[in-house]
């Protein structure tokens, strides 16, 4: 069978937005144009694809975007893309607009859509875009570095006022199934306790006992970093205050972690990944996801990537506990 010729590349962002997505879009557009290809941007992810919200992109269309947070193509979640009918319709629309290859920037759900499009003959490459680093095949996802720094700066401010008032603070960060944001923020902010969905070691009685003991050791504050997957931060704070007598406040950082200008790392890594995605399509590859491991950019079969399991580095978690004295 003759190798598919790539003449036009599409690019979309799907699911939650992440700082650095614009850098990736920019790299896809300019790399493809530099290699003589046409580029079509798809607005609002798979929802926009199904509604034919498709525009031509030039080098100027992505000017002044590398430093901007969010995604210039907009993003959305799309239930219709989960159905066989929606997937077949999406593939037909790609063919209608001459899109031979598609770069999908997003997470697991976005990659499942890319996998189905590949089955229907649209060459697809995925770029990892969840800010909580929950893609198992890679040590880096677009936006994670910015999200960590955004959360760290916010937690520093909460810590300042917690010390002044000799207060306990329960600070909730994103991470439904993955605790990387909580772990990194916990280490970076010197938290006394980090609660991770992967560890299954949440024991409120032990936390309360530790808070009481820390007061005896002269600690003026007690910082708990709580991953979204554990949740219940508001009620947790109320129970802690009731049992310890220590004024306790809950802070949920929420969607602020998705915003803001991307860090240098996110701009550089996203740019490299976007450029590599175009190269992979020109090599005739499909149903692949770009990752970063052991200092190298690599690509995996999407099916294999989705099947991988990711755990928290225990040595990092142990270090966090050792330092919280």
Please annotate each region the language model reported.
Residues 137-148, 261-267:
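Short beta-strand elements at the ligand-binding edges of bilobed clamshell
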